[in-house]
Amino acid sequence: MNKPFIDVLAGQRQSAPPVWMMRQAGRYLPEYREVRAKAGGFLDLCFNPEMAAEVTLQPIRRFGFDAAIIFSDILVIPHALGRSVRFEVGEGPRLDPLDTPEKIATLAGHADLTKLDAVFEALRRVRAELPKSTALIGFCGAPWTVATYMVAGQGTPDQAPARLLAYAQPEAFSRIIDALVESSIAYLLKQLEAGADALQIFDTWAGVLSPREFARWSAAPTRRIVEGVRNARPDAKIIGFPRGAGALLPGYVAETAVDAVSIDWTAEPSLVRERVQSKVAVQGNLDPLALMTGGAALDQAVDDVLASYAGGRHIFNLGHGILPETPIAHVEQMLKRVRAYKG
């Protein structure tokens, strides 16, 4: 049976675009909150194959999305590199900062992927239960974005600690990037082996970089990951998500050779249509706040996205993750409108 999501990545335009949502397994769902409460900590949920598989499948059962994305986190790679990673309630991730060349010199060059066996087992469990027409997405964080957390030891408003280190100590910073590139290649290949149909590389903080730094620290490492995966799996379908890239999107697509690019809601539609969608599939890009608002505002926002990208290959998604406060009825409203569309 065909998988519409994979068909788009393979070059086939669909009249009604396939649809899924970033963070579709999340706190807006009561069934997720129930499992999350049983799991204990966030990483406990990520590393419990039974629970991680369950929350991955929940939005598929409820909404029938065209793709499931494995429930995990971009910071499992630092964990596999031997770094301390913990999630504190109300504060987000905490790591031991790698903010000097001396500390960076202690970083392992390759991840111990046995620490991520639970992720691969969760993928196998989801694969066994997914409908035949539903794709399964594996993922990793892009090296730049993961490095911002590793350098600062936490999320920061403007990623200044990583940006400063990259300017002041580029050789030391490159060591972090190199370790993340090699580890991400191995991690993504193991996800494909475990049953993933496609992969997404999340570069959440790409948009804070200058054009020169974007080319060096976002696009180039992503290209290396794509090349490394395809050297072993030439048929691998890979989506890049350089959030906030804006006018740099065409260059990113050309440099990385991804099969599709996910875009946020600030992307200029004419630029994307003419210089991006003419070459690869486009995924996105509903504003999560429009989804949270609902009503006529949501209908208009959905229609705008559909009309903007109807002429080419398109996967309907949000421009970033769904917000926890979003009513389920608004997701149903969005899906009804997308599925009725005949572009």
Curated annotation (Swiss-Prot):
<feature type="binding site">
    <location>
        <position position="73"/>
    </location>
    <ligand>
        <name>substrate</name>
    </ligand>
</feature>
<dbReference type="GO" id="GO:0004853">
    <property type="term" value="F:uroporphyrinogen decarboxylase activity"/>
</dbReference>
<feature type="binding site">
    <location>
        <begin position="23"/>
        <end position="27"/>
    </location>
    <ligand>
        <name>substrate</name>
    </ligand>
</feature>
<dbReference type="Pfam" id="PF01208">
    <property type="entry name" value="URO-D"/>
</dbReference>
<dbReference type="GO" id="GO:0019353">
    <property type="term" value="P:protoporphyrinogen IX biosynthetic process from glutamate"/>
</dbReference>
<keyword id="KW-0627">Porphyrin biosynthesis</keyword>
<feature type="binding site">
    <location>
        <position position="320"/>
    </location>
    <ligand>
        <name>substrate</name>
    </ligand>
</feature>
<comment type="subunit">
    <text>Homodimer.</text>
</comment>
<dbReference type="InterPro" id="IPR000257">
    <property type="entry name" value="Uroporphyrinogen_deCOase"/>
</dbReference>
<comment type="pathway">
    <text>Porphyrin-containing compound metabolism; protoporphyrin-IX biosynthesis; coproporphyrinogen-III from 5-aminolevulinate: step 4/4.</text>
</comment>
<feature type="site" description="Transition state stabilizer">
    <location>
        <position position="73"/>
    </location>
</feature>
<dbReference type="InterPro" id="IPR006361">
    <property type="entry name" value="Uroporphyrinogen_deCO2ase_HemE"/>
</dbReference>
<protein>
    <recommendedName>
        <fullName>Uroporphyrinogen decarboxylase</fullName>
        <ecNumber>4.1.1.37</ecNumber>
    </recommendedName>
</protein>
<dbReference type="InterPro" id="IPR038071">
    <property type="entry name" value="UROD/MetE-like_sf"/>
</dbReference>
<comment type="function">
    <text>Catalyzes the decarboxylation of four acetate groups of uroporphyrinogen-III to yield coproporphyrinogen-III.</text>
</comment>
<keyword id="KW-0456">Lyase</keyword>
<feature type="binding site">
    <location>
        <position position="204"/>
    </location>
    <ligand>
        <name>substrate</name>
    </ligand>
</feature>
<keyword id="KW-0210">Decarboxylase</keyword>
<dbReference type="GO" id="GO:0005829">
    <property type="term" value="C:cytosol"/>
</dbReference>
<keyword id="KW-0963">Cytoplasm</keyword>
<comment type="similarity">
    <text>Belongs to the uroporphyrinogen decarboxylase family.</text>
</comment>
<feature type="binding site">
    <location>
        <position position="149"/>
    </location>
    <ligand>
        <name>substrate</name>
    </ligand>
</feature>
